[in-house]
Amino acid sequence: MKIKRILSATLAAAMLLCYCALTACASKPAAPTAADFEVQPGAYRYQDMGDFFVETEQGQYYLGWDQIIRFAEPGSRSFYPLCNKPNCGHGGENCNAYTDYALGYWNGHLYTTTYGDNGPVVMRMDMDGANHREVGRLPVLTAVDGARHGSGELLFHNGSLFYMYDAIETDPEWAMSIYQFDLETGKGRWLFQEDIPLFTYSYGSSYVNICGDDFFFKIANGVTGECTYALGNLKTGRVEATLPDWSNRNSRAMEQDSVLYYFKADAGLCEYDRATGVETVRFPMDTYTAFPCYTRNYILVRSTDTEDFEQCTLWVLDRDYNLLGKAPQEKIGRWFPQPYAITANSIYFWLNGKITHYIDTSDLSNLELLPMPDTSNARAHG
């Protein structure tokens, strides 16, 4: 996301389990263990389409367009502002739940960013939203004409913040750039500098995925318009391979056991074996584009069926590509709700800057979107 509060459409995934606490409505949900998470807390959530959703043993957190962090107890779907200050209106910098941009987790703390005169500032806070303090600052790029630039998009993964800077296209030799910031030490390094060609720009977090030590991102050539999908390695800081002719209608890729999984335009759901270089179409789809979310046990797909974006469909398949459920989406107002985050008991949907609906994962043959609990007049959390 460019330094503005627009959440991109992206890939996601999670496992088909229910928290046992849901069977006892009157009791407080049991705290989840590490086995309940699709990825470990702090790792990049490849199963989600939204960026700023955090799931830990303390509960679930997400950041809305209103710049308020919201929290739900483990197993619950009721989200509240992460602030326990009395009489707080939850709308300004004095609120514990308020932040400028981004939300991540690492080692018992939440992380976010604010924007000062000298560029983006990385902040650390306690899990209840209290005790905001500065960790460090991200670099600001200086153009040939002396102008300063700090716009870009960011992601969190395993103790690092990854910042994808916009290219400074006024420079004679411009290109995109990616910076890795350590959340513990405040130190950083530039990634893939030797491998990113000149006159290229990033497609942002919509096309980025991080799986273990692999960092996948899309590179667009600003001169020819051609796009490639880069397969980078975080240990070496180098791009190991690229997939050419990556259509704007393709999804981003997720990797498991050296196999890439993605939607390919005019083909369908595909697998690409990195060892052999062989691509296989596993589930043909006649749709304009699609964004799959891969979990351990199932695949959720939201397809855009027509070029005018006026028809969308939800699909659920098992990992052997057997169709479990399919349903056309309906607009709410002008827009279709989009899949945002997947937990053990819910597929959350996003509309107009917040989570508004969910699907209960206990029965994936029923893809009915249910409204989220109304917490507008309820207490805050902290």
Give short role names for the model-derived ranges.
Residues 1-11:
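Bacterial N-terminal signal peptides that target proteins for export
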Residues 62-64, 111-113, 162-165, 216-218, ...:
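Residue position within the beta-strands of beta-propeller blades
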Residues 56, 64-66, 75, 106-107, ...:
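Short loop/turn segments that connect beta-strands within the blades of beta-propeller domains
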Residues 15-19:
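Hydrophobic core
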Residues 21-24:
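C-terminal motif of bacterial Sec signal peptides marking the signal peptidase cleavage site
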Residues 28-46, 68-92, 120-143, 170-197, ...:
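Surface-exposed loop/turn elements that mediate protein-protein interactions on large endomembrane-trafficking
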Residues 45-56, 91-107, 141-158, 196-212, ...:
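Repeated scaffold domains used in trafficking and secretory/extracellular systems
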